[in-house]
Amino acid sequence: MEEIFISILNLISNEIPQLSLVDEDYGQLETSEDTYPVTFPCALIGNMEADWEEIGMGTQKGIVTLTTRLAIDCYEDTHIGSGTTEKVAERLRLANQLYTTLQCSRHSDDMGPMFRTKTKCYSLPGMIKVYEYVFQFELHDDSAAKD
């Protein structure tokens, strides 16, 4: 699973160079500190979960769920009439770029393509906008199989 995770991080970093940080999500946006331990815009990948089905002989097939979060600081005044409403469109384009980068991507011979299953947008304290995408893919794991 680690090779898949690292491959996803590398793909995002290579395809979206305007991100200042691409990292594993370990709660950086939920910190109680006054400042976030990340730079923006950033992509955080985590909350991996799998439901497994035994195939036999130590081999399993799983459906893996993975969450990606694009976080952007929003200090521009973007109300209608401000002249900076284009900033909203820029954020949405960047969020869509994260989605299209991962949609149908494969990161191992043992996995199927990644498909988006859920989208959620929300704000965090400190004027941070988060675009969250949940992806699923099938994974064939024979790491416990006896030779």
PLM region spans:
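Charged, amphipathic alpha-helical segments and their flanking helix caps
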Residues: M1-P37, L44-D147
